């Protein structure tokens, strides 16, 4: 019984120190929050719907990927604007963001990334802090500024048991 109370006392003394060590002080929180800036995308910038620039419901993910990436590059080259993903499901491959572009998903829009490795080119990225070349993530940005992903739509990366599980390749997970 004596041992139990000693252990309990030690635990009670350690709990506040653990909470203090992991806690954020308010000044640090405010410093970080104040360093965050909104992207420099003009609020009055023109909007470009992907459906008006070649993306369609009844085409391959590769065709939509090409149309979306071409539109993003065009909008960036024009000085910026909003690329709109309209309400519906749009299958695509990797999307590469460019400077001064807001990728906006309307309510009810689904940007669905296809499970086709050829649609994800090798790009410079990092894995657990190590720089490397790897398959592109669904949405990729490198050496760009002032980008945003906004709206009430859904980004579906396709992470389900049929696509992700076989790539994991580790039997200990199931």
What are these regions (language model features)?
Residues 2-84, 89-102, 106-174:
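Extracellular "leader-to-stem" segments immediately downstream of a signal peptide or signal-anchor
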């Amino acid at each position: 019984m004596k041992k139990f109370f000693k252990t309990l006392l030690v635990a009670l003394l350690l709990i506040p120190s653990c909470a203090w060590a992991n806690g954020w002080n308010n000044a640090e929180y405010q410093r970080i929050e104040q360093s965050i800036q909104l992207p420099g995308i003009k609020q009055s910038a023109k909007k470009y719907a992907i459906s008006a620039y070649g993306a369609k419901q009844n085409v391959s993910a590769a065709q939509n990927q090409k149309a979306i990436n071409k539109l993003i590059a065009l909008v960036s080259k024009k000085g910026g604007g909003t690329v709109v993903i309209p309400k519906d499901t749009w299958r695509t491959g990797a999307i590469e963001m460019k400077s001064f572009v807001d990728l906006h998903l309307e309510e009810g829009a689904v940007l669905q990334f296809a499970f086709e490795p050829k649609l994800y080119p090798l790009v410079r990225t990092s894995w657990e802090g190590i720089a490397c070349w790897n398959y592109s993530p669904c949405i990729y940005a490198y050496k760009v500024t002032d980008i945003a992903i906004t709206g009430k739509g859904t980004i579906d990366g396709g992470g389900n048991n049929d696509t992700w599980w076989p790539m994991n390749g580790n039997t200990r997970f199931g």
